[in-house]
Amino acid sequence: MRTLLLSLSIFLLAGTAVQAQDTNLWKTLSKITYEKKFDELLGFKVDVPVFSQDIQDLEGKVVEVSGYIVPVEGYKSHTEFVFSAYPYNMCFFCGGAGPETVMEVTSVEPIKYSTERVKLRGKLTLNSDDINRLMYVLTEAEMGKGAT
């Protein structure tokens, strides 16, 4: 009986941790600063993200995040798209939000486009080297529990 109660408690706490992670992930991802670095190809200095330790700790980890699928030219596939903390009219590409509020997504299975908030689960990769890509990349993504 003790083992059953202990197992149930651990299971419930783990579920709470994922929910808390989902709620705070975009907030954590906003903990960045920038430094200027010379880009050889462009011939001038560009802003490069400097990730906080909290963000670095998430590198390569499976995370769950809620947000909106952004229809962006060049990301037409249902397995490759941009994901935003905010709806399309408020996201980074339409003004107002910063680059830390969007991520590139590569999914395992095609994910149907929706204008509603959806939840994704995948492995987070950080990008501070390639200025032609977003700073956050979610790979092996799939719809998370409680997704709409």
Model-inferred region functions:
Residues 3-14:
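Sec-dependent N-terminal signal peptides
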Residues 20-148:
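OB-fold and OB-like single-stranded nucleic-acid-recognition modules
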